[in-house]
């Protein structure tokens, strides 16, 4: 899809590079004509140069994470942000709040809910701003498992199609608390098997006979409190969080502990799931599940900086469902 035009002056387009052909083959890219192919190749090569220069900083010990080419390689940062993000202005409503508790004695230094069976495999939202739906199902899947012992993949597509009266706007964004409100009022959410994901807006096809889980409400973590978020992740389970992911460094993250100095604690545009925490190389991190398939990041996950002044706003808007 051609969504913009680059003005190229004095740029000689060389013969197609092997890396470009490899990228197209790996990700099944087919463009409408040679002009768009050339346009996308310029973007790809610019992104490739950015990755190479960033990784030199990693090799020199200047940064704590590295980057790699992925399926977003032919997209500008503006296109990436427009297509892959999915948060809209929040509605304010009364809700219970989880405040950090004063604790004494040693505390768990690491938590990983994947090892306890509370996390479904990494999913793929496709080119649809439905990250909020995946964060919603992820936290509810975890809470349902912890209550019943059964891990069931829940239907993001139902949230995309059916929850608009409660605030979410399908592929144009939404918020997890509004989705929790919908699930509560609807008396449940179907299994993913019964209501498969399509990565597009559709008509509501909810089937009450396929309900797998429900919730009775939700609780917010005290805004901005990484201590509160840590306690919630440790004691409650996987937690829905929202972050500032509007950076090329996030677009091409590969491994290591992600710290972005230009991140905002209040400009939040992407919903993900905090499934644990730990430390690596002296750097505290949050273990975060994304919804961009396993080809992105560290098999679909990212380690985000913890205890560094709420970097990227990971503790600004965090919540979990009550089951």
Curated annotation (Swiss-Prot):
Active site (catalytic residues): 131, 270, 290
Keywords on record: Disulfide bond, Hydrolase, Protease, Signal, Thiol protease, Zymogen
Xref: SUPFAM superfamilies: Cysteine proteinases (SSF54001)
Propeptide residue span(s): 17-107
EC class (word): hydrolase
Domain of life: Eukaryota
GO biological process: proteolysis
Disulphide bridges, residue numbers: 128-171, 162-204, 263-312
An annotated Gene Ontology molecular function: cysteine-type peptidase activity
Enzyme Commission number(s): 3.4.22.-
Signal peptide region: 1-16
SMART domains for this protein: Inhibitor_I29, Pept_C1
Family, similarity comment: Belongs to the peptidase C1 family.
PANTHER family xref list: CYSTEINE PROTEASE FAMILY C1-RELATED
Protein name: Digestive cysteine proteinase 2
Species this protein is from: Homarus americanus
Chain's gene name: LCP2
